[in-house]
């Protein structure tokens, strides 16, 4: 916060090589002149349940069903969780008090996980769907900050009884009676082509042309052309703060925040 405040006082925000920057050791965009690219994703529908908790509150949630907690200045309520389905990530990896978590983890009636490894999460689950690794499936490797899209071709067949996440969820959809609605009669390669085609259309608005999917898949990667002008963070805001407001209550750089000050 004070770094942004100092940069604002110096008046360099929105200028080339000026302003401020964070996450230099955790993101791959340092010195990157590319704008954020509109890579597309799979259609996901809308979850009708809007309630949520921060992931760091998992243990608290299991310990205190119906209890209240503070989040972003609001009072939210913990649900009474009877079943957990965890796919992607591992709560036993990023929670500090593991003894507390292990005890709270016993409260739900059923724990289901998609897991690659026989780790703590798998050992504390009731049902385990053995998921395979990125080496055992076809996929795309991309990042909105990265100008290169890579064809991630599987290097080996699935080990033993492991399955891709798509195969696991398709199997569940079949058992629940909505296989066709979930898969739309597409296999994994069809969905990869869908992402490619929809990304190609999105990039046309930026005057970027994609090759044919078959040519990309054979070559193994596609690199976007470098823009003629480099992007300067907050340059539009500097030129016209009314037309390009920031995502703050005031639309400006806030050295102090009445909203945060009112948090209990």
What name fits each language-model region?
Residues 4-123, 133-140, 217-264:
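Extended redox/cofactor-interaction regions of prokaryotic respiratory oxidoreductases
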Residues 43-48, 155-254:
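N-terminal leader/propeptide and maturation segments of large enzyme subunits in energy/redox metabolism
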Residues 126:
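Catalytic, metal-anchored helix/loop core of enzyme active sites in primary metabolism
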Residues 129-130:
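Catalytic alpha/beta core of large soluble enzyme barrels
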Residues 135, 147-158:
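Short beta-alpha connecting loops at secondary-structure transitions
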């Amino acid at each position: 916060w004070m770094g942004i405040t100092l940069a604002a006082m110096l008046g360099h925000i929105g200028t080339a090589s000026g302003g401020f920057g964070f996450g230099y050791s955790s993101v791959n965009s340092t010195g990157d002149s590319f704008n954020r690219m509109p890579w597309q994703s799979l259609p996901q529908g809308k979850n009708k349940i809007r309630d949520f908790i921060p992931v760091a509150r998992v243990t608290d949630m299991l310990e205190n069903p119906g209890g209240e907690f503070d989040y972003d200045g609001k009072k939210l309520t913990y649900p009474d969780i009877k079943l957990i389905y965890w796919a992607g990530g591992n709560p036993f990896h990023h929670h500090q008090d593991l003894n507390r978590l292990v005890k709270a983890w016993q409260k739900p009636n059923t724990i289901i996980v998609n897991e690659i490894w026989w780790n703590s999460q798998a050992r504390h689950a009731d049902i385990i769907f053995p998921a395979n690794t990125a080496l055992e499936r076809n996929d795309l490797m991309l990042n909105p900050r990265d100008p290169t899209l890579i064809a991630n071709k599987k290097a080996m067949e699935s080990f033993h009884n492991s399955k891709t996440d798509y195969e696991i969820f398709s199997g569940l959809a079949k058992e629940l009676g909505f296989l066709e609605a979930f898969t739309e009669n597409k296999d994994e390669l069809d969905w990869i082509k869908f992402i490619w085609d929809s990304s190609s259309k999105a990039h046309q608005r930026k005057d970027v042309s994609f090759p044919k999917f078959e040519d990309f898949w054979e070559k193994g990667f596609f690199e976007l052309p470098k823009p003629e002008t480099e992007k300067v963070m907050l340059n539009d805001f500097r030129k016209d703060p009314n037309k390009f407001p920031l995502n703050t209550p005031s639309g400006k750089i806030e050295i102090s925040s009445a909203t945060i000050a009112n948090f209990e």
